[in-house]
Amino acid sequence: MDNKKIRNFAIIAHIDHGKSTLADRILEFTNTVSKRDLKEQHLDSMDLEKERGITIKLNAVQIRYNSYIFHLIDTPGHVDFTYEVSRSLAATEGALLLVDASQGIQAQTLANVYLALENNLEIIPIINKIDLPSANVDKVKAEIENTIGISAENAILISAKNGIGIEKVLEAIVNLIPPPQASDEKDPLKALVFDSYFDIYRGVIIFIRVVTGKISVGDTFKFMANNLKFSVIELGISSPNQVKKEALFAGEVGWVAASIRNAKDVEVGDTITLVENPAKSPLPGYKKLVPVMYTGFYPVDSQQYNLLKDSLEKISLSDSSIIYEPESSKALGFGFRIGFLGLLHMEILQERLEREFNLSIIATAPSVEFQITRTNGQVQIISNPSLFPEPNFISEIREPFILAKIFLPEEFLGQIMGLCQDKRGIYVDLEYIDDFRRRLIYKLPLVEVIFDFFDRLKSLSKGYASFEYEVIDYQVSKLQKLDILLNGQKIDALSMIVHKDFAYPKARDLTQKLKEIIPRHSFEVPVQAVIGSKVIARETIKAYRKDVTAKLYGGDVTRRKKLLEKQKAGKKRMKSFGVVDVPQEAFLAILKTNVNEK
């Protein structure tokens, strides 16, 4: 195949800027999918993606346009799924920068554009939704030039919803995006593994971008990270349904089935090469992202532990950022500690486990990795608050800090700065983008951001603010472990790490919430928040009382007293042996303790 006729590209856009709609129009205009078969958000295969109106998993599809072959790699736009974007950009030569004509550049768009610029991709600016009454094309063009530093003079104006300007986009892909680098078929194979998923019949299917050489059915290849060898049984392209081929050549994007049965054998971002004619070094520039938060997942039914284990293994195949290890809790039994890229990432996984594998999950409150220096000089990295040493054994605690870049209209500046101060933020800079928009830069503790920062940011700015962040370093902080006792017993899964200055209001807020959420029992349940051995907040869940005197009528009052005394003794006995039922909402209550006020 002539390399000069191939174009590989991705679409960069913020949530709701019309990326999946543009992908639909391209599929429709090129007759890749007939109008009859085309569904909205055609490349978003998960029900969750369609319901939430977001792209979670990337998708790769081959499109024929005149004599050219395009490989469109559809990418997510949410901050939690940056790792998906980095994968797709590593497999392309160009990117369509899609910006909403009424909303302009958003923080996550900018983060992804910088990723594209780092990969030396050709960027084509496209302004979408030009048919909206609130569209301001000139303002958006100026924003693109001032913020990103690329010319927007020839930006393509489109309405993806109404199909306006789609042909201009296709012509720009042909004329502006460079073809893949030429390579001889005899060159050693180098192919980037940019995605994978588990097929119950064929094992792990890997998606690759061939950079040099070629790969054919029957070839034996190896992963360069772990040297494991497999033979190609089937390979082909997605158009968007899978189409089998005999070989994939340099510049092509396709899938490979090789009877890979073990999920852990595939590492997304790895390079594959042929055993007979191996490449000397893997492809450069791929970054493996590290989880930023950790959560405990426990099956409600302890019999489902093995099902949860198998389900996580299958899902982790198509989501390489998930890291998990077994853990146990006195309150919840056996489960897993799972690393995520953010709260949305965690919610998506929990929903997938419940929908696709019929699991009922209890998720504990998220935490981050803390660096703890013990009094004997030993340094530990701990992500589970219940594993923290006692306070008298801790010399210092360091927590991860992020550099947050927040884009917002000028009118919301005061409220957003107040939010950052509430979250223990350290002011860094304020940049003026234009007459109306500002970029606010703060250093913030990561543990404060993973809870509700994104929701509160959107709420305070009426949805107009957006932000991106990167973890920069660890800093010493005055942190303490807050434990919760129910009926005198420590519930390890409810432990949390709080800043010393906010411990009392947080403890008070949490005990009040738990009092409302935990159902009443037939015995009184004290809810206590403790630091070390000191109780700093307490609430009591009153017992419900069965009317043991209902059967009495008339008669002696001593009979009534006797029954009530018997009930009282029974409750006392039940209190000492009783088990308190803790619903899922109790763990979620920790997420909603926003009290960062002294």
UniProtKB/Swiss-Prot annotation:
Gene Ontology MF term list: GTP binding; GTPase activity; ribosome binding; translation elongation factor activity
Entries under Pfam families matching the protein: EFG_C, GTP_EFTU, GTP_EFTU_D2, LepA_C
Gene3D superfamilies, alphabetized: 3.30.70.240, Elongation factor 4, C-terminal domain, Elongation Factor G (Translational Gtpase), domain 3, P-loop containing nucleotide triphosphate hydrolases, Translation factors
GO cellular component: plasma membrane
Binding-site list for GTP: 16-21, 128-131
Catalytic function, reaction form: GTP + H2O = GDP + phosphate + H(+)
Membrane association type: Peripheral membrane protein
Subcellular location: Cell membrane
The enzyme's E.C. designation: 3.6.5.n1
Domain tr-type G as annotated: residue spans: 4-181
Protein name according to UniProt: Elongation factor 4
Organism expressing this protein natively: Mesomycoplasma hyopneumoniae (strain 7448) (Mycoplasma hyopneumoniae)
